[in-house]
């Protein structure tokens, strides 16, 4: 038996597959999900989702920008604002974005702006980290 995974963004169903295993970036750390997982609703952080498809040792990686995951009866429904396949991210652009986001946060003196810059850095870090998984 496998898991039926749906990743939904505001505009559409982004991705649907039957998979063996999924690792989610929850607000309290990474959470692995296999078949017959207990039902749970969890918040997702900005980060990387890793998916292993049936009868494969290869993992598919996606960057998501927070949301929620509902796990119930071997169905995993993921609702996020943005999703992007790791394989579609340009390594050089991700590195530049990560470095500039890090620099902007370090140079910032405005407390109110720090929150936005921190979110930008988390997204840029996830995008850069996922490019390193492809190697």
UniProtKB/Swiss-Prot annotation:
Membrane topology recorded in Swiss-Prot or TrEMBL: Peripheral membrane protein
Molecular function as annotated in GO: ATP binding; proton-transporting ATP synthase activity, rotational mechanism
Pfam families per UniProt: ATP-synt_DE_N
Localization in the cell: Plastid, Chloroplast thylakoid membrane
Cellular component per GO, a single term: chloroplast thylakoid membrane
Gene3D superfamilies: F0F1 ATP synthase delta/epsilon subunit, N-terminal
Main location: plastid
Record-linked SUPFAM superfamilies: Epsilon subunit of F1F0-ATP synthase N-terminal domain
InterPro entries (alphabetical): ATP_synth_F1_dsu/esu (IPR001469), ATP_synth_F1_dsu/esu_N (IPR020546), ATPsynth_dsu/esu_N (IPR036771)
Keyword terms, alphabetized: ATP synthesis, CF(1), Chloroplast, Hydrogen ion transport, Ion transport, Membrane, Plastid, Thylakoid, Transport
Classification via NCBIfam families: ATP_synt_epsi
Function (record text): Produces ATP from ADP in the presence of a proton gradient across the membrane.
Record's subunit section: F-type ATPases have 2 components, CF(1) - the catalytic core - and CF(0) - the membrane proton channel. CF(1) has five subunits: alpha(3), beta(3), gamma(1), delta(1), epsilon(1). CF(0) has three main subunits: a, b and c.
Family statement drawn from the similarity comment of this UniProt entry: Belongs to the ATPase epsilon chain family.
Protein name stated in the entry: ATP synthase epsilon chain, chloroplastic
Organism: Euglena gracilis
Annotated gene: atpE
